[in-house]
Curated annotation (Swiss-Prot):
Keyword terms: Deoxyribonucleotide synthesis, Disulfide bond, Electron transport, NADP, Redox-active center, Transport
Short name of any one Pfam family annotated for the protein: Glutaredoxin
InterPro entries: GLR_AS, Glutaredoxin, Thioredoxin-like_sf
Effect of residue 16 to A: 20% loss of ability to be reduced by thioredoxin reductase
Record note on what altering residue 21 to Q does: Complete loss of ability to be reduced by thioredoxin reductase
Disulfide bonds, paired cysteine numbers: 14-17
Gene that produces this protein: NRDC
Protein name in the entry: Glutaredoxin
Job description of the protein: Serves as a reducing agent for the phage-induced ribonucleotide reductase, but not for the bacterial ones. This specificity may be the result of sequence differences around the redox-active disulfide bond. The oxidized form accepts electrons from bacterial glutathione and will, in turn, reduce other small disulfides. Can also be reduced by NADPH and by bacterial thioredoxin reductase.
Length: 87
């Protein structure tokens, strides 16, 4: 199953997050969406820490959303890289 870390657009607009979810749906690929901001302006520290660990990073500075992982756990990247993954 794909994992998509990002923002729920009802809370924080993220066109690329929406596009990633839409692409996976169109491709009929199961995915788990992990919302890193449950409330406006409030990050889920546990989910951010999980994501940073997966990426081997110690800071979220410069980190863009979404961040997508393949079913095997490998990091794909953002929406543009996800689109390339399916070409």
């Amino acid at each position: 199953m794909f994992k998509v870390y990002g923002y729920d657009s009802n809370i924080h607009k993220c066109v690329y997050c929406d596009n990633a979810k839409r692409l996976l749906t169109v491709k009929k690929q199961p995915f788990e969406f992990i919302n890193i901001m449950p409330e406006k302006g409030v990050f889920d520290d546990e989910k951010i820490a999980e994501l940073l660990t997966k990426l081997g990073r110690d800071t979220q500075i410069g980190l863009t959303m979404p961040q997508v992982f393949a079913p095997d756990g490998s990091h794909i990247g953002g929406f543009d890289q996800l689109r390339e993954y399916f070409k």
